[in-house]
Structure formats: C-alpha cells, structure tokens
C-alpha cells in the first residue's frame, strides 16, 4: 500500500486516495550570472542634461513626475559621479574595473538606449537659463533616489516616521557639498504621488546601480546612498537574519545549524547555501541582485526560509530583542514548533557565555596558564566510572552542545518548560505588539498557559 494514501468508506464503499494540497508553484531563481554579461536595462533616448534637469525639477515642484523621464535622467546623470576604483573589481567572472580606473556607476551595467524621445515638459523651469552645476545635479539625483527609500517604508503607523525620514534626507541635500534646490517638504509631497515607485523595475534597477557604486567608491557625493541603501540585500531577510543570529550567539554557520532539530530546515538550509552564489563576496552583484533583476523570486527571503526565520526570531524574542519582537511571523511555517525550539535555544544562549583568559602580563604567565588548563583537561577526561564518558555531554547541565540540548528537549517531551513560557510572557507582555508580530503571537499563545 502506498504510504501517501488513506483508506476509508463512503456509504459502505471502500475509497482509497492520496490527499494533495496546493503547493508553491513558483520556482526560486538564484542570482548567479552564468553568461558573464552585465545586468542590462533599456531606456529611451538619452536627454540633454540641462533640459532634463529643468523638466525633472519642475515636475518635482509640481509633485508630478514621469517615471520614464526620471529613469532616463538618472542614467544620463551618472557622468557626474566619476570616481577611482580602489581595487580590481570582479563579480561572477565579470571584470567590472581595474584598480585605478576612473569609473562612473554606468560601468556596472549595460545601459541600452532606444530612439524614443522623453516628454521633458519645460513648464515651471524657465527661470533657469544657465547650465545646472554638478552640485545641483547631485542634489536632484539624491532627492529622486530618496523616493525609492520612502516607497519601501510600509506598514501601519508609519506616517510620522516617514515624514521625519523625508525631512532628514531633505536636509542632507541642501547642505554642502549639495545645494538646496527645492522648498521644505517637497520630497514628502512628491513621494505621495510616487508611493509605489519601488515596484517600477527600471527605477529599482537604477537605485541598485547607484548604491552598488557608492558602497565601494569613495566620493564627494556618497551621501546619495541615503536613498538607495535599502537595495542592498533586498528580499534577503532570511539570509540576513541568519547572519545576524550566528553573530549574536557567537557561533559559526556550521555550528549553529547543528541546533536546528527539525526536518523542515533541510530544504531551507540547502536553499540558502546553494553553491555558486557570491553570498560572502564583498561588492558582488549578489548584494543587489533583486534590484538588478537577477532573481524574480528570491530564495533568501523570509518566506523562502520561513522555518529558519521563525526560529531565529523566537530565539531573539527570548533574548528580549526588539527587532525580533516586531518581526512578522511566517504563519505557514510551524510557528508553534519553532517557538518550542526557540525557547530551548534561547535558554542556552541567553545570559551565558564562554570565557577564557587571552591576555597575559608576560610569556611565563601565559605558559603557566596553558599548563594549568592542560591539567584540567586531563582530569576532566578521566572516567569516574559513574557515567559512560561518551554520554557525558548528553546529561551535563553545564554543556550547550547540540547533543545536550536535543536530549533536554526529548526529556521534556518536545514541550516548553514553565521557565521558558514565563520568559516568553515576560518579554512579550512588556512590548507594544504590532499585528502579526512575534510579540503578538507569544502573547496570544502563552499568556493563558497554566503550566
């Protein structure tokens, strides 16, 4: 009999069937570039920069911008940001630049142009008869790219936060080396007319190009990154959370994964560490793969590795981390089971550390310390006859080895202990819970637990 089938009767008739549910029809696409071709973008005819500046500035003052014109201008304005490449720059086998080369953001990608003219409305810009200066172009580019960051701020009760961010960014682009080109609050007013621009592929692409450039090249106008920094590791919340997690608990990625006691982690860990990706290469195209269009469905997002994401943030909640308490639970990825494992791992790594002397007054003191430690190790390895030495890690209350933690979970029947629940309630009840957050989940799940 097929193990996936079930048997039952309907009106005395024997029925045998295989229950099937809706599965994820999307295929995760890895960002590795196989053909050694730079990411490309197609835009309209390159504009006259003076005309484009006047038109875009006029549109910003009127809170009415054409996204195609904005993208065409942003690509053309890259000529103002020439910098020196500090080292040979290679990614996925593509030679981007050599050390000492003078480069602009355009060197990172292939920008193709058609003969299609832009709209370039002149209304409202007649007062500017001279050519705009480089600081004026830099200020306009910076303000336009700030629209990307503002459009990425979503969620409830973000009104004041978004306004404050917009005001701070405006202040950056009205002080040296930039110059003031718009009135106060213009950025926020314009954003309201462009609230979804982060979903426009060409605009997102150009924001990623500028960010990748300024993240490596020291430049007078590097503050432009204030609007584009959100393109770095975009749709990588799962991988970023895992990286933050292993640093917090002071383990290597290999050692941390040994504590992931659940079969649903297998596919996610395989997905996160797919060979051939440049996840650990500085200044790689990987960092901006989402904005550069290298992956339609990220294999590194919180939804792609939901069990891992849930576990990491339950551990974070146990440790009282606000970021974890505010994060959104992936409801389809066993949050109840992950909260149990998170409690045990939180207990192991919260309020405890592994310490040893590393600095000494002189070489003799160092040698004496090493000799004393060696003696302690020899004594510890001696079998006292009460417990099989191979099993000591399983039963010792002082060890935090994966085997010991797993044994404690099994001895408790895979259930949280009273102390775990008390800790979860303590951290979540003192936090203003956002809808669907980990804090809300813990409050609803364990607040009424009578254990």
Curated annotation (Swiss-Prot):
Homomultimerizes to form the nucleocapsid. Binds to viral genomic RNA. In nucleocapsid, binds protein P and thereby positions the polymerase on the template. Protein P acts as a chaperone on free protein N to prevent it from aggregation before encapsidating genomic RNA. One of its GO terms (molecular function) is RNA binding. InterPro entries: Rhabdo_ncapsid, Rhabdovirus_ncapsid_C, Rhabdovirus_ncapsid_N, Rhabdovirus_nucleoprotein-like. The gene is N. Its main location: virion. It comes from the Viruses. Phosphorylated by host CK2. Unphosphorylated protein N seems to have a better affinity for leader viral promoter encapsidation. Phosphorylation of protein N in ribonucleocapsid may stabilize the interaction with protein P, thereby playing an important role in viral transcription/replication. One of its GO terms (cellular component) is viral nucleocapsid. It is found in: Virion; Host cytoplasm. The keyword RNA-binding applies. This is Nucleoprotein. It comes from Irkut virus. Displays a superantigen activity in human and mouse, activating mostly V-beta-8 subtypes of T-cell receptor.
